[in-house]
Amino acid sequence: SENRGSTSITDDDLFLRMDVSRNTLYVGESLTATLKVYARVNLVDVQGKKIPPFDGFLTEDVKIPQIHLEREEYNGKIYDRVGVLQKTILFPQHAGTLTIEPYELFANGWGVVVVVSLMTFSGIPVMSGYSARANP
């Protein structure tokens, strides 16, 4: 049997990152959350274990036809395999702190679990005289 334990993948080799267009917004305004995988190892059989629950947000998924891997620099390091796994437009449904739960990923059949950190957002109530408008 093959010894898969001889190859260890570090947090720098494979991780997920949720890019958001902003962290503070008015109730009814939107933000875009883009889930990206960053890898310095070959990626085979990438599968999300669970989609992050966007509790407190109305969501609209943006269709991603397939994962297209590109080269990108992040925190001073070059990653040859960076791809968008999911893109979602989020609309906060109430004021206060809103949270996106961690996300888990299995890759390369090794059962490697990569987790996106917990994220929080501030939903600001709509002010008197201000009408929330959808962002283009």
Feature names for model-found ranges:
Residues 1-136:
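Surface-exposed interaction/ligand-binding surfaces
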